[in-house]
Amino acid sequence: MAFGKSLFHAIGRVSLVRQIAAGLALGIVIGSVSPQLGLAAGLFGSLFVGALKAVAPVLVFILVAATIAQHQKGNKAHIRPIIVLYLIGTFSAALTAVIAGMVFPTHIVLAGAGDVSAAPPSGIVEVLKSLLMNLVANPINAIANANYIGILAWALVLGAALRNHGSDVTRQVVADLAEAVSTVVKWIIRFAPLGIFGLVSSTIAETGFGALAGYAKLLAVLLGCMAFIALVVNPAIVWWKIRRNPYPLVFTCLRESGVYAFFTRSSAANIPVNMALAKKLGLHEDTYSISIPLGATVNMGGAAITITVLAMAAAYTQGIQVDFATALLLSLVATVSACGASGVAGGSLLLIPLACSLFGISNDVAMQVVAVGFIIGVIQDSAETALNSSTDVLFTAAADLGRQRNRAE
């Protein structure tokens, strides 16, 4: 018993990042050496992601409602500058992907469209309609289905009603509930090393690395664009806001948010992680409690890259030459589509046919491109989610720190 306690204390003294690194390394070894054991270990990953996904909608609803209910008149949440950064970042990602697609034209071997079961949206109007319908969804269904647009809308309405008509005791109860749910999130995050060990070992056991070799160039363009956004474009945007070296903040967000998101492959599951990081960075709670769940829905730079690169690859594969004007239009369509990706089953991949329609590519061919996306999804989706989710907290921090700098001046 004493040995067990001392072991837990020793593990507790090791930083969470190092524990995650150890879990990652062990997962790679187990998944490679013993696929059967790796698949069995996948249960830990499923439990970890399931717990995060389960608590995230409740956390967002209660935290946003509590924040609005306790919001004092005269205090501003300063959400608008963050939304502007989200849109700039997403459009920059789409434009970067267009340029990369023209500089490194990629031809792909089309996979069978039968591998894709879901139906893509018929047009941009359907994407926007889906977003608006999510806004007025039943609040219980919104929480149950992790519909964050609906959750945000109802939390804002309930919080405003409590602020104007609730008693001090009622508002305090909601605040205590928010604190309790935040504590539960901290407990879940402590199991991240075990969860990531399970996710990595099962992924490698299931797919290995051979399935990705045939699409190496396509993956290189996708990952290159995402790395360029994460390490060049985003830091430039952050510098514009805070006017000092952005890289310490950028690397903190990538390390403490991007790593989790890469392995969970879920922006929703990463919301509690981003909330905890925002609190650690000392950001304004009235701001990040709204901007981070909103970012998980509309800040989709990684999705814009995926849509653009695969649509251009489809065009080149069909022998279609892409002129700059069409490419620029593709950037705009990809930006709007990416912002609606969370409202579409299948996310960014099923918005590819919408982008392909700009080039007159048939739906049959477009769905084969989507099937290719699912083949490389083990890497593409992980990198996309890491970029999307880490950028949520990065831009929130940049806007908040920029506001503090302006106030100091």
Curated annotation (Swiss-Prot):
Its main location: membrane. GO terms for molecular function: neutral L-amino acid:sodium symporter activity. One of its GO terms (cellular component) is plasma membrane. It catalyses: L-serine(in) + Na(+)(in) = L-serine(out) + Na(+)(out); L-threonine(in) + Na(+)(in) = L-threonine(out) + Na(+)(out). The chain crosses the membrane at residues 24-44, 48-68, 82-102, 142-162, 194-214, 218-238, 292-312, 319-339, 365-385. NCBIfam families: PRK13628.1. This is Serine/threonine transporter SstT. It comes from Neisseria meningitidis serogroup C / serotype 2a (strain ATCC 700532 / DSM 15464 / FAM18). The lineage of its organism: Bacteria, Pseudomonadati, Pseudomonadota, Betaproteobacteria, Neisseriales. The gene is sstT.
